[in-house]
From Swiss-Prot:
This is Ribonuclease HII. NCBIfam families: PRK00015.1-1, PRK00015.1-3. A divalent metal cation binds at D33, E34, D125. The keyword Nuclease applies. It is an enzyme of class 3 (hydrolase). InterPro entries: RNase_HII, RNase_HII/HIII, RNase_HII/HIII_dom, RNaseH-like_sf, RNaseH_sf. It comes from Moorella thermoacetica (strain ATCC 39073 / JCM 9320). Endonuclease that specifically degrades the RNA of RNA-DNA hybrids. It comes from the Bacteria.
Length: 206
């Protein structure tokens, strides 16, 4: 289906930060975002993506604004069309040993390390990565401001959701395939009834 002029304009506007850096001579720009800071269960997942300059992907947006089925379609396109992409994970045990902010930063670092191409600059959603030896720009609400971060937000969300669906068959009774570990009413009721499983974060209030 052909994208409307308005949709093309919207997606092109997401490249404003990338174009600004490219005008300064920066070639390879990675967007980084995480998923899973708020759940009671499961890992924190991050993704890093380097897109070709100006690549048009119809529907590209902050993952929270994209329906699940469309997110999966977009993830496949992003993996196929990107110059490089990587996923980083931080386990429940690591989250409990660190804290959720530190765990999110570690997931982002691991996603960057998983890239087959080293970026020249990193656009990060909402936070800075201390000690990163690559120039970086943190953008609050970056998944709605940068195409690269939006692409990363989709990959991170899809990867984590798929894992939580798989975990639902192992840790039954918590509805993980539906709630993805987030603190829904049904999830909290299951916790009261069953107690926490190995996937639940002990450092979070249940």
């Amino acid at each position: 289906m052909r994208a409307s002029a308005g949709e093309r304009e919207r997606v092109e506007a997401l490249y404003a930060w990338e174009r600004r850096l490219q005008r300064q001579g920066v070639a390879r720009i990675a967007g980084v975002d995480e998923a899973g800071r708020g759940p009671l269960a499961g890992p924190v997942t991050a993704a890093a993506v380097i897109l070709p300059p100006g690549l048009f992907i119809a529907g590209l947006n902050d993952s929270k604004k994209v329906p699940p089925a469309r997110r999966r379609e977009l993830a496949a396109v992003i993996k196929k069309e990107s110059l490089a992409w990587g996923i980083g994970w931080v386990s429940v045990k690591e989250i409990d040993c660190l804290n959720i902010l530190a765990a999110s930063r570690w997931a982002m670092r691991r996603a960057l390390s998983a890239l087959a191409i080293r970026p020249d600059h990193v656009l990060i959603d909402g936070m800075e990565l201390p000690g990163l030896k690559i120039p970086q720009t943190p953008l609050v609400g970056g998944d709605a401001l940068s195409a690269s971060i939006a692409a990363a937000s989709i990959l991170a969300k899809v990867a984590r959701d798929e894992l939580m669906v798989a975990y639902d068959a192992v840790f039954q009774g918590y509805g993980l395939a539906g709630n993805k570990g987030y603190p829904t009413r049904e999830h909290r009721e299951a916790l009261r009834r069953l107690g926490p499983c190995a996937l639940h974060r002990r450092s979070f209030k249940h």
